Amino acid sequence: MVRSDNDTWDLASSVGATATMVAAGRAVVSQDPGGLINDPFAAPLVRAVGIEALTMLADGKFDIEKVLPESAARVRANIDEMAVRTKFFDDYFMDATGRGVGQAVILASGLDSRAYRLPWPDGTVVYEIDQPDVIEFKTRTLADLGAEPTCERRTVSIDLRDDWPAALRAAGFDPSAPTAWCAEGLLIYLPPEAQDKLFDDIHHLSAPGSTVATEFVPALKDFDPEKARQATETLTRMGVDIDMPSLIYHGERHSASDYLETKGWQMDSAARATLFTRYGLPAPGHDDDDPLGEIIYISGTLR
C-alpha cells in the first residue's frame, strides 16, 4: 500500500506492523537472561496483535536458519540491532531522568513498554503519543496482563500529522519544565518536511535542559527501492506482509543532528558499530544489500 497524507493503520498493517516487528525483535533478545535488555511485555503484545510469523518469532518457535537459510545472518543482525537500539534509548531515558528531567515524551510510541518496565524516578510523567487505535490496543492489552506503569503514564491519542503539541499540552504537559524527547524508529516514515516540522515543534515545546534522542539514516537520499524490495521478499517468506519500499519516505533531507544544532541543541552522535562495541556485541560488517545503510544514533541537550 502506497503511503498517502492521510493514511491510517493498525498494529497488523502498514507502519503499525513495523512496530509489531520491532517488538518481536525485543521479545527475542529478552529471552537471554544475560542479554542487553529485558522487555517482558514484548512477546504478549506481539501475540495479541496476532501476526502468526511474528508471534512464532517472539515465542522462540521460528526456525530462522530453516525458513530463511540465505538471509539468516541478516535477520540475526537485525535482531541484535533491536537489542542495541533499545538499550541506547533505555539508557538515554535513565540518564535524563536521573539528572532531574521530570517528564518524558515518546513520539509514535507503538508497542513501546518503557512506561511499564523502566525504573523511573518517583514522580516522573511519561507521555505516549500515537494513533488512537494503537494507544487503546496497548493500554487494554497490558491492563489484561495485570501490568501497571512504573511512572505516571499519560496517553495522547493523536496522529503526529495533526496538532499533537496542543493535544500534549491538554494532557498536562508542562513546556516550562525540561523534557526527555524520544523519536525512536520514526524519521524514515516521515517526509523530509515533516521531519523538520517535528523538530520545530519539539524545540518550541522545550525548556532549557531538555533532551532529545533519535536515529538518522543518511542514505535515505540515495535510497534504493530494489534493495528494499529484497527485504520485503524476506519478510514475505517469513509470512509477514510488510511492503517496506512503500512505507519509507526517501530523498534529500536535513541531518537531524545538524538541524537541531542550528536551534541551540548540543548534539552527540554514535554510529551503529560504535554502539555494538559499547554494548559488547560484534559490530556488523558492511552489507551492500542493506537498503538503509548506516544508522546514526543521536542525542542532545538544549542549552
From Swiss-Prot:
EC category: transferase
Residues bound to S-adenosyl-L-methionine: D130, D159, L160
Keyword Methyltransferase attributed: yes
Record GO biological process: methylation
Entry keyword Membrane: no
EC number(s) given by UniProt: 2.1.1.-
Pfam families linked to this entry: LCM (PF04072)
Gene3D superfamilies in alphabetical order: Vaccinia Virus protein VP39
InterPro entries linked to this entry: Ppm1/Ppm2/Tcmp, SAM-dependent_MTases_sf, SAM_mthyl_Trfase_ML2640-like
Annotated GO MF terms: methyltransferase activity
Sorted UniProt keywords: Methyltransferase, S-adenosyl-L-methionine, Transferase
Family: Belongs to the UPF0677 family.
Role: Exhibits S-adenosyl-L-methionine-dependent methyltransferase activity.
Name recorded for this polypeptide: Putative S-adenosyl-L-methionine-dependent methyltransferase MSMEG_1479/MSMEI_1443
Organism: Mycolicibacterium smegmatis (strain ATCC 700084 / mc(2)155)
